Amino acid sequence: MGVNKIMYKGKRIKLIWEKVPDCLGIFDPNVNTLLIDPKLKPSTMAKIIFHELWHVICYFNKTNINLIGEEKTALLSEQYAVILKNNPKLKRLLYKCLKRKK
């Protein structure tokens, strides 16, 4: 898949592309590992990546995701993929804004 790590707040999260039983992706904070099923459709994969990144963000910001709930986490975090898919100009603008300067 090309991406094998994610950096967040000075922490390295190892990204492993493999099927996990009974889920599409999972973040394990005990070993800073994110597993994602590589055989997902691209639109589903984007939603799962945003969803799991939300788990990463909550964990490293000491936010109890159980208070938010898995259903709300899914509903809200996965909408980034929907917005970006339906707004290519916005996606390009964000990419330009985040692009590293040489």
Model-predicted regions and their roles:
Residues M1-T44, F60-K102:
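Metalloprotease/metallohydrolase-associated module, dominated by Zn2+-dependent proteases
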Residues K47-Y59:
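Active-site recognition of the HExxH zinc-binding catalytic motif
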